[in-house]
Amino acid sequence: MTVKTFRGSPALSEFRLTQLQQKCQQYQLPITSVYAEYLHFVEQKTSLVEDEIVKLQALLHYGSMFSELKPAGYCLIVTPRVGTISSWSSKATDIAHNCGLSKVNRIERGIAYYFNIERDLTEAELATLKDLLHDRMLETVLNHETEAALLFTQQEPKALTTIDILNGGRQALEQANIALGLALADDEMDYLVESFTALKRNPQDVELYMFAQANSEHCRHKIFNADWIIDGKKQDKSLFKMIKNTFEQTPDFVLSAYKDNAAVMEGSKVGRWFPDPDGQYRVHQEDVHILMKVETHNHPTAISPFPGAATGSGGEIRDEGATGRGAKPKAGLTGFSVSNLVIPNFEQPWENPLSKPNRIASALDIMIDAPLGSAAFNNEFGRPALLGYFRTYEEKVNSFAGKEVRGYHKPIMLAGGIGNIRGEQVQKGEIPIGAKLIVLGGAAMNIGLGGGAASSMDSGKSKEDLDFASVQRENPEMERRCQEVIDRCWQLGEENPILFIHDVGAGGLSNAMPELVHDGKRGGKFDLRSILCDEKGMSPLEIWCNESQERYVLAVAPENLELFTALCERERAPFAVIGEATQAEHLILHDSHFDNNPIDLPMNVLLGKTPKMTREVLSKTVENQSLKIESIQLKEAFHRVLRLPVVAEKTFLITIGDRSVTGMVARDQMVGPWQIPVSDVAVTTASLDSYHGEAMAIGERSPVALLDFSASARLAVAEAITNIAGTLIGEMKRIKLSANWMSAAGHTGEDAGLYEAVKAVGEELCPALGLTIPVGKDSMSMKTTWIDNGEQKSVTAPLSLVISAFARVEDVRKTLTPQLRTDKGFSSLLLIDLGEGHNRLGATALAQVYKQLGDKPADVVKVQRLKDFYNAMQTLVAEDKLLAYHDRSDGGLITTLAEMAFAGHCGVEVDISALGDNDLAVLFNEELGAVIQVADSQLESVREVLKAHNLLGIIHQLGTVTADDRFEISRGSHKLFSEKRSELRSIWAELTYQMQRLRDNPECAEQEFEAKKNPDDKGLSAFLTYDVNEDITAPFINKGVKPTIAILREQGVNSHYEMAAAFDRAGFNAIDVHMSDLMIGRRNLAEFNAMVACGGFSYGDVLGAGGGWAKSILFNPKLHEQFSQFFINPNTLTLGVCNGCQMISNLAEIIPGTENWPHFVRNKSERFEARVSLVKINEVDSVWFAGMAGSHMPIAVSHGEGQVKFKSVEQFAGLKAQGIIAAQYIDNNGSPTELYPANPNGSSEGITAITNLDGRVAIMMPHPERVFRAVSNSWHPENWTEDGAWMRLFRNARMVF
């Protein structure tokens, strides 16, 4: 075989090159300029002929939007790691084969960097430069393209090694423990020596590694299951038993707890929407139960933030999908706690420039890269990210261990979410003897080794290379393919071939497969070489124990293997049968290459009664001084608090994440016409035809634990309740909690504090409230230690409990937001003060911004009053008594009021005379409570409800809402604070601006920041030239044969369900059509009246967004002919949305009337943009937009490559002259715009929808299918009832037939 190199397009934009050059300058590298472009390396089985080369060059021409320069200068080429096959390569090679390029064995891609240098680089400088350019776990740096042949060399498999404990005894095991990073405790080593001595043989390295992962703190939760002795007194219960006590006291509505990958609670009976085996989408009336899971991925995120956070979200998604016999993930949440950001040129008064170890990322780097990783995975998988929190803390304080630095050098990366599951598939099935044991998903690579053990160590106790090796890498498009297989399986109901399923996470197959057979009360016999591998030189340990992502393990009965195989092949999801279940509970792993058994162990040695931990600890108390606030000025204090990340605007964390996919999002973070990120709760609909739904909210007050462990835990639970109380749930028992506990186990005072906190929640507060904690996670190594110039240093996180609350929702339309209303007549603002006037300032945002801690923190004052508050809110929500609601939390009352004013784009006038004597204490305390806006006409009836729930004594009328730009606080006649709301809004937005400036295109960051300063911004609006509530297809319903539409998808597409639902509502028969169906002839486009290409990430956007999908059609003669015939047929309609829009734009050469169509390239911001944008519909001759011309309407936008790119100025002029620009982005004044973020991608003149000349073919980047229901719009006018404005587009299509 030979390797041929093809140049590609420029890889980096001008500002990205500038950023790279600035990094080089930071390290004083003698580099004056940088240029980068893609190189493609093609391994040929035999030489390609001329027309094949032309086809391949066309395939490899994609994404060109940057200035192309002539390569010159010192060159380094970054490629995938030698010996591996990248996920990009797998997808690009698949596309090439689908295009008929059978002589291509494999395509790989690299980036060539060209540097102009002032002098030769030293070895140290070269090493530094290489570190800046590549990820050493995944990539290699080559010096010349001639070295590319190394990428295609196959290495010989490495052999296993044996640890000689029969002769070397425990000492041999101790050496292996250090060398392999096993994190085995002393008693575990004794257990292993004893066990293998009894077996009369030495252990293999893979057996020890498997044992270490399966029995790590990360996997076995030894501290939570330990016996406890505190201050010499034996405790009655373990931590886990106290958590389980909540379920024992309140098991109501819980269907599965503590035994599966996620917990399940009772949901609603609704019309579930999915395709039947014949391919037609239909409604299925059934119970749709709710599953919930929240994970953390702290250690990997500290080491390598983007992949660490990405695989954190990916692993949690797999947990949901692998619940029961298969389930469907639905909506996600994320959270981050880090040390101080110290943003260059935006340093804050409370931030100390403390050091950190080199092996971990800085807080700033984590918050630039980790949220992108988490968002990217959710986006590509197709799960909306609707909820989150972000806290920074790093301060030298007097706490339980004396004066020390407390903070989050080891960060918290929280990943969680909800999903849905069928009632009959909640419980896992039986595994029969002989069942096929299957790995579904991507191939193994030598990455993510030892993640479970590494996560169980305090940061600093393992070697740096082991730290880095323990970080996994992500491939979300592969996980989407796997999920499609799981969906096809559970959708078969009783015919579901999946009997048992687990996800592959910490420990890889070494943990997942033993867990699968052990839970099924079986053993297993496995074939090592049946495992799919993308790295042939791996040892048995590396194959069995690596944590390559996007994999699941399943048990399938032999008679159902053919069905399962067919489902996988249709979705192009790789899988391998690697073993069979055995009656004997014994694990055998055979290696046919070396003809030996790397594993031959009884299950009870691996997962049996390993030594139980006993924690003998002492409790500690702390005495602190009260806050020194005498010299603090209110204005300065509030400005500081508004800049503190836990309070500041977090748009930079939100608009990077898709919040509309599924079409079932009823409440995301962004609130009201001005899309302000202040929602307390996330809400989804249970189906695409119902108002039942699900809600999620977060509670977290970790700094309080530096003063009072149990108060911090109680506040986390209570805050989750005050956040979720603004939607219609019903009785509190309906709410279920996930508890994620983070602690520095072994640190002075922390163990006893952890026990105290768990007891406060598990034994006291939750049982008193009727709350259950059926799921959770612990991370017990939240301490970072290192040596700095010979000095031992450490940063220890506070005990951190993050509570995530989940609930069934009775009616998603009854969800309050913090948006103050000025269009509802006279109204009043009321404070419900659950703190009952205590006004404690310990561990508040105010304390933090003045580098203090204080003495007394907030706490739950009366448990019954919290319950009364919740019940009162449920009554008020059900009866539509309130206009707005926002809980009091970080930043205190003044922040609550400001955020409500920001959301309402209005002013407030309040008087705090009745709340206490100390202004700062009144305004900045973080006691529990909420502010409600009540129309004066409802004031008396609201008071009656509050009185009925014993709350009247803690209600305070604060003041009123005004339509101007003033934010005013008074004490009687004395004005304490008066400032323009718009100026406060600007201060609040500074953090987002600063982060976007560093991370994204700085020009876009500037434009958005300026837009936020505008006090006259009108916000989103809707002006329709038709009646939104009119169904123009009503005369056709149930008359004649329905037209059929192909809901076309390729691997990685994720928006097909909601697209099918929209067309079904319009009167079509919607048919699920995968490209694989067309390729092998299961389906033909000639069967359909219409076709829609759906949104998502086909082929993971390899070869350009939509490019690979399109080229697999253009270069496949059979598909080329089929699509061409469909497009020229005057009786057909075609729609392309988002990824489908990008794809169809690349088919322009076979679509009549499209000679002036543009291509779509990367957004100007160079960031995935998820926004609600305003568009204007133009007068075009197209059935799709009939009757809509002149309308201004909001629509969901979610894409990374939506900017139009024309071949020439003449082509752009030609498009305009043809009058086929159907829609343009407009600003809030109704004018087409190129300014960000009103125009989210920078398209010329705001172009976002185009038709062909006869109007039968339409392409558009925004998502009408995600907002065809009014309830799924983030904001909409109140006169919209069931249908959203975009339902008209789908009904227009039906009118043709």
Curated annotation (Swiss-Prot):
GO terms for cellular component: cytoplasm. Residues 1045-1297 form the Glutamine amidotransferase type-1 domain. It is found in: Cytoplasm. GO terms for biological process: 'de novo' IMP biosynthetic process; purine nucleotide biosynthetic process. Pfam families: AIRS_C (PF02769), FGAR-AT_linker (PF18072), FGAR-AT_N (PF18076), FGAR-AT_PurM_N-like (PF22689), GATase_5 (PF13507). It is an enzyme of class 6 (ligase). PROSITE patterns: GATASE_TYPE_1 (PS51273). The keyword Phosphoprotein does not apply. The keyword ATP-binding applies. It catalyses: N(2)-formyl-N(1)-(5-phospho-beta-D-ribosyl)glycinamide + L-glutamine + ATP + H2O = 2-formamido-N(1)-(5-O-phospho-beta-D-ribosyl)acetamidine + L-glutamate + ADP + phosphate + H(+). ATP binds at residues 308-319, 889. HAMAP family: PurL_1. Monomer. This is Phosphoribosylformylglycinamidine synthase. It comes from Haemophilus influenzae (strain ATCC 51907 / DSM 11121 / KW20 / Rd).
